[in-house]
């Protein structure tokens, strides 16, 4: 994943997105569904109907970037909400991109060295 500047927020756009949409179509969804400026520098993540493809829209200060990832097996974990946005941490975004369930992470207890 590309390093994000400090203070960058990550938003999952709930619901199903038409993955045929490109820069302008996804930016319009950000404006209407989340009421956030897509040129704010925050990261916006969209998932299609099948669940194996996500798109990430990000303004890097010079232009819009659009990243896509398709899982070879399985589906990306997505919230049940039909609309709106859900804030993720950068760590949760990394887990999402790896196909890990970012909602139920468990920290293991450190082992005791005797």
Protein language model annotation of sequence segments:
Residues 1-114:
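Polybasic/polar functional segments that serve as interface/processing modules
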């Amino acid at each position: 994943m590309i390093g994000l500047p400090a203070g960058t927020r990550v938003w999952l756009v709930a619901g199903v997105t038409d993955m045929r949409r490109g820069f302008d179509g996804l930016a319009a969804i950000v404006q209407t569904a989340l009421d956030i400026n897509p040129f704010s520098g925050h990261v916006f993540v969209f998932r299609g109907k099948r669940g194996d493809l996500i798109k990430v829209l990000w303004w890097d200060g010079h232009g819009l970037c659009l990243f896509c990832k398709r899982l070879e097996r399985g589906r990306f974990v997505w919230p049940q909400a039909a609309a709106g946005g859900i804030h993720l941490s950068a760590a949760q975004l990394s887990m999402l991109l790896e196909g890990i369930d970012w909602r139920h992470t468990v920290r293991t207890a450190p082992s005791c060295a005797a």
